[in-house]
């Protein structure tokens, strides 16, 4: 279709809905306060920012910790303090346990039959049970330790070869995390791993990209006439072909001799074949959950590693203390995952990194399942809800010097990742808390300990710590706008 024709249709549709909005009755008399709405678009323009979590925090200073935004036709509530986050994810958790329906999640995750996007109900409960007890249990995560060790040994050899020259730390950690996740999820049964990873990033970018029809549900035809839906369906077909080959290869090789040798696809196929659930698991369910596993941690773990190293490069005293701890605890040639239990300061660094640099500062949106009341305001059913986890993490009422990187703040503190402390919710909380929490931490703590034990690190070209650019950008997650490039130097006493 000609671009001018598409443009004309868009304009005509928006004018129609603007008129419709002017005469549509307000179904709630007591919505939370919020910034003024522009005609047609409402508050969409206020989220068109490289750092929307910061924009929303600034708006909350003016309009309050619970705000109403009109994003096109989508009524949206934003909460920005620990108290209000607790109202959403604990007090009224069952009322806000749904996910908004999106065209992209329906296409890429087999009609949202995964764990992340599935609507709240019996199917979701059963699949989360599988995830918690089988796929991502602490025992299962430990069984992947050899995969992590093997990948970090490979990385170490590369860094030793490139010693004394700048390396792209950001790209290195992304590749490392992708390799471990693919091996843990798929085993050796993916001959198209490079293509699969490329497609996964395309999916993640699509899910996080601006899509006009997401804000105007009655304009879904725009995805058709613009060619977007055809493009998404083509991407999904390529992904499904790879997923189908993976299932065939797993079935051909037969079951693993014991559970410690199972990858995540093996686990799902075993559950599918043996039953034991209140639902009939199909191949589509298996593929949807596998895609969840592959996409959920792909960007967040590497982003946390990037920010942790960035803060250590900016704070040489912290770097020195962390390295001294690792090198005093580790007794052999290699860091083991058992050593992590004694790396107290390193764990504080990871905690503080995820507080100040939450990889997903705005948690995955929730949707109100029924009319309810929060903090004295009416929240109608189908309202989209955004929890600003980053704003909770820098809330001045909960944290001293909230904008400063101070790992010691967690010393002798009971605050943890588990979702009970609403001033600290990098993995979310309540029924929809991220089930991959243990796996995600294993992909941050162990690699970071490895990097600090085997190498000293310097900034390139004589750069000073305070000169390091920490400009943020939000795409799939919130990362450095410019990749972190640093110089590795193997410890002479440890180098081969």
From Swiss-Prot:
Superkingdom: Eukaryota
E.C. numbers: 1.14.14.150
Tissue: Expressed in floral glandular trichomes.
Record bears the keyword Zinc: no
Coiled-coil annotated spans: none
Binding annotation for heme: 434
Function statement: Involved in the biosynthesis of germacrene-derived sesquiterpene lactones. Component of the parthenolide biosynthetic pathway; parthenolide and conjugates are promising anti-cancer drugs highly active against colon cancer cells. Hydroxylates germacrene A acid to 6-alpha-hydroxy-germacrene A acid, a precursor of sesquiterpene lactones that spontaneously undergoes a lactonization which yields costunolide.
The protein's name in its UniProt record: Costunolide synthase
Gene: CYP71BL2
